[in-house]
Amino acid sequence: MQTFLKGKRVGYWMSEKKIKKLNFQAFADLCRKRGIEVVQLNLAKPIEDQGPLDVIIHKLTDVILEADQKDSESMQLVQRFQDYIEAHPETIILDPLPAIRTLLDRSKSYELIRRIETYMQDERICSPPFMELMAECDEDTLKILEKNGLAFPLVCKTRVAHGTNSHEMAIIFNPEGLWSIKPPCVIQSFISHNAVLYKVFVVGESYTVVERPSLKNFSLGASDRASIFFNSHNVSKPESSSVLTALEKVEGVFERPCDEVIRGISKALRQALGISLFGIDIIINNKTGQHAVIDINAFPGYEGVPEFFTDLLNHITTILQRPDQSANKSSVEQTGSSLGERLCCTPPARTDPWIVETDTSGSVKLQSQRLGCNSSVSPSFQQHCVASLATKASSQ
């Protein structure tokens, strides 16, 4: 039975490109059938004049990044948005700006995943160790790599996890290849995963898993192979094919992701960040069968998710039906306050045998990482590609 919510108003802001790509007008029509009015916001004008608003859906990632680069217009837009949020704590924001900023920084999001894994203590999950490279590599860099379990081949990504440049990546096979890398960037150990990526598209408590091709397997250890530079977005398009994804044969373990594991990771991220609309890229280690989270994306494209609008409307309906919207907002942000504080605020205990504390030089920042999940290599990396819908489930 459908719930009718007459008088409720949902505002949204996203780029015209994303509006067209999602065909968001269809979502607005779906909402109106439930009595919900949908309003496209103009951030160049006072939001107060466009209210009242019960929920705001946004994709402000580009604007936030431009504001961080001191673009005056973007700074004004973000400030206007923030001012409205502070003046209207009863309005539900999908999703909170602090959470979006975390997901825009790969170093921060990888650290969050590491803490989530430590908190969950699930041996079926082990994401790659990573380093943040702040300056050009030297001999000390190689020593830190070796000391902390990062092994060739390595995957190099931009620290910023959004925008065209964020898809520019490299696979580095030897020390010589490191010299050509331009910092700042994030480095992860690559792990073979039989050229399969699982993209998890989350909408509140529901998620859909889409299977896509990924990078083929590469042998562990340094080699004289030249570095491979590529654009992961081009490799990942559903209609694309690439020699980088051509798998000659399946090697080692070939397992599909476990629903229980995905549900747990999704729930932990929702609780830690208070987010509802995000994507998780997962690969399966072909030596251990462990799940590795290799990227988290704010408000992804939801390609291959035919029921995205239905899931989104159901999620909005659920949060609007809660007794007190202000209480609801605090629950969204604080549901996992205990978990969030432990994951995001509390430094890991130095006595914890699973944690390697930061050991840095002036040029390299090594994030704390779990060791022991794979004695030979650590899982890795961000890759996507062509798609078929795999599974749909509820994360509760």
Swiss-Prot record:
Positions with a binding annotation for Mg(2+) 2: D295, N297
A GO term from the CC aspect: cytoplasm
A Gene Ontology biological process term: necroptotic process
Annotated Pfam families: Ins134_P3_kin, Ins134_P3_kin_N
A GO MF term: ATP binding
Annotated ATP-grasp domain residues: 117-325
Residues bound to 1D-myo-inositol 1,3,4-trisphosphate: K18, H167, K199, N297
Source superkingdom: Eukaryota
Sections of the chain in a coiled coil: none
Residues at which ATP binds: 106, 157, 188-199, 214, 232, 236
Cofactor(s) listed: Mg(2+)
Keyword hit for Cell inner membrane: no
Reactions that this protein is recorded to catalyse: 1D-myo-inositol 3,4,5,6-tetrakisphosphate + ATP = 1D-myo-inositol 1,3,4,5,6-pentakisphosphate + ADP + H(+); 1D-myo-inositol 1,3,4-trisphosphate + ATP = 1D-myo-inositol 1,3,4,5-tetrakisphosphate + ADP + H(+); 1D-myo-inositol 1,3,4-trisphosphate + ATP = 1D-myo-inositol 1,3,4,6-tetrakisphosphate + ADP + H(+); 1D-myo-inositol 3,4,6-trisphosphate + ATP = 1D-myo-inositol 1,3,4,6-tetrakisphosphate + ADP + H(+)
Keyword entries, A-Z: ATP-binding, Isomerase, Kinase, Magnesium, Metal-binding, Nucleotide-binding, Transferase
Span of the signal peptide: none
UniProt cofactor note: Binds 2 magnesium ions per subunit.
Keyword Transferase set for record: yes
Gene3D superfamilies: 3.30.1490.220, 3.40.50.11370, ATP-grasp fold, B domain
Binding positions (Mg(2+) 1): D281, D295
Top EC category: transferase
EC number, as in UniProt: 2.7.1.134, 2.7.1.159
Family listed: Belongs to the ITPK1 family.
Subunit field text: Monomer.
Official protein name in the record: Inositol-tetrakisphosphate 1-kinase
Organism of provenance: Xenopus laevis
Gene it is expressed from: itpk1
